A protein has these predicted regions:
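Gram-negative/organellar outer-membrane beta-barrel architecture
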Residues: 1-183
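C-terminal outer-membrane beta-barrel translocator/porin domains of Gram-negative envelope proteins
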Residues: 2, 152-282
Length: 282
């Protein structure tokens, strides 16, 4: 659910500023969302955004919180009649009715394992400000966030069992001069951001070169507090192929460049979290 034109200031002043049960009038946004895929995945979040924080200048401020849990598949699934029939059909050439085991179907949901899971929750606060220099198209934002990971027999990270904490600050300098946020016909966009955690390994007095990557106890201790510095650069340029004044829906040629770098403070303590994926945006 998304409530636009929300007003936190009018929350305790019912009357003409209310529309139904919600206060209106300040252009703020309140968003509450939930997503679930039965027993395997659940996600809940709430956020508040004020584009005119303070009421006098277009300074943005937001608060948000989220919680999610994802479970894994039991090893019994891969030994089920469904999987066995699939592999048997591949190697024996049986492509008929029995290949899909319709008569004895073992559905995926019967094999979820609640003991194998990753739980995450976090909170964040963001402040953004328009800049006058170098020009009026620049904006600076700063976000302080905290996430906690709770892993139970989760085989997709070096830390399979444990609790990891991620406290970071994200600083972003951006510029946008596009003429339309939905269908840009001209102008450009760019952003340069850095996300930093405290360099714990530089002052905790621990020699991480002696930690073993095959020991779960060592991995839990090493990544109890995650550390990294993450840099990202994104740029888009929109070039109209026809005169945008004369042709409202002119074809547009877009050029795009993106760059990302995940760094570490200690070569023996590299973060398994916040990494980049091939084909993803990090």
């Amino acid at each position: 659910m998304k409530f636009t034109n929300f007003s936190l200031a009018n929350l305790l002043h019912p009357g003409e500023n209310y529309r139904g049960i919600l206060p209106q009038g300040d252009g703020q946004t309140l968003t509450v969302s939930g997503q679930t895929n039965a027993k395997y995945y659940q996600s809940y979040s709430i956020s508040f955004y004020d584009p005119w924080f303070g009421g006098k200048r277009p300074n943005a401020f937001s608060l948000s919180a989220f919680y999610s849990v994802q479970t894994d598949i039991s090893s019994r699934y891969y030994n089920s009649a469904y999987m066995n029939s699939y592999y048997n059909s591949m190697y024996s050439g049986m492509y008929g009715y029995g290949m899909y085991n319709y008569g004895n179907y073992n559905s995926y949901e019967n094999y979820y394992d609640p003991d194998k899971s990753i739980k995450m929750f976090g909170v964040a606060a963001m402040f953004g400000k328009r800049l006058k220099w170098p020009d009026d198209y620049f904006q600076f934002t700063a976000e302080l966030s905290y996430q906690r990971y709770i892993l139970s027999d989760w085989q997709y990270f070096p830390v399979t069992n444990g609790k990891c904490n991620n406290l970071s600050i994200n600083l972003t300098l951006s510029r946008s001069s596009i003429d339309n946020p939905i269908y840009p016909r001209s102008g450009s966009e760019f952003s340069l951001s850095v996300q930093l955690t405290p360099p714990y390994s530089l002052f905790d007095g621990t020699d991480y070169s002696k930690y073993s990557t095959t020991s779960q106890d060592d991995m839990n201790k090493m990544h109890k507090w995650i550390e990294y510095h993450k840099w990202k650069f994104k740029s888009k340029v929109y070039i109209p192929l026809m005169d945008p004044v004369a042709v409202k829906r002119t074809p547009v040629l877009m050029g795009r460049v993106e760059f990302g770098l995940l760094g570490h403070y200690n070569k023996y303590k590299k973060s398994p979290f916040e990494t980049f994926d091939v084909g993803g945006d990090g």
